[in-house]
Amino acid sequence: MLKYPDYISKLISFLKKLPGIGFKSAEKIAFELLEWDPSQIEAMALALQEFSTSHATCSNCFCLKISQTSPCNFCSESRDSSSLCIVATPKDVFALEKSKIFKGHYFVLGNLLSPITGKHLSLEKLAILKQRIEACSPKEMIIALDATLEGDATALFLKQEFSYLPIKISRLALGMPVGLSFDFVDANTLARAFSGRNCF
């Protein structure tokens, strides 16, 4: 059986690591890149290199830094410190920012509890979250997680973990279809879900 040259096989193997990209899609992308001008490929390689060395997260909220200011833009005093929104990924922060409904602070968990795979939350991040809540005393903690089994399990865990604090704990409701990830929810739907959040 005839095999692809190593440089194509290697590229396909890397592309397959991306979510939603199987062998056929990776193969298609690899052969599309063969048609690109070498300068475009070099520019892409440079962008990937810059991406790997330049991205940074805030040590306070774990959001992606969009500038070198400290605290980060999402932790600045210009935002409403009375509400803290818990999300799973830095991408979720930008999704909520597009909805223009939330002006408070964020905290990025990084991953969700998974009853199926046994995945746990980061103990280090939980400790930082506790310190932040106890130090800043927000009035409301909004759990903005995917409406999935993992999101439900994580939300329940957080509710139990912080039930000793005099803080309102709410979760996004109206407009968030069950089983759907933030990635597939538009800004208007997120805004409605935020407005319709319930005590949890």
Swiss-Prot record:
The gene is recR. It comes from Chlamydia trachomatis serovar L2 (strain ATCC VR-902B / DSM 19102 / 434/Bu). This is Recombination protein RecR. InterPro entries: DNA_Rcmb_RecR, Rcmb_RecR, Rcmb_RecR_Znf, TOPRIM_dom, TOPRIM_RecR. May play a role in DNA repair. It seems to be involved in an RecBC-independent recombinational process of DNA repair. It may act with RecF and RecO. One of its GO terms (molecular function) is zinc ion binding. CDD domains: TOPRIM_recR. Gene3D superfamilies: 3.40.1360.10, RecR Domain 1. PANTHER family: RECOMBINATION PROTEIN RECR. GO terms for biological process: DNA recombination; DNA repair. A zinc finger (C4-type) spans 58-75. Residues 82-177 form the Toprim domain. Belongs to the RecR family. The lineage of its organism: Bacteria, Pseudomonadati, Chlamydiota, Chlamydiia, Chlamydiales. Keywords: DNA damage, DNA recombination, DNA repair, Metal-binding, Zinc, Zinc-finger. Pfam families: RecR_C (PF21175), RecR_HhH (PF21176), Toprim_4 (PF13662).
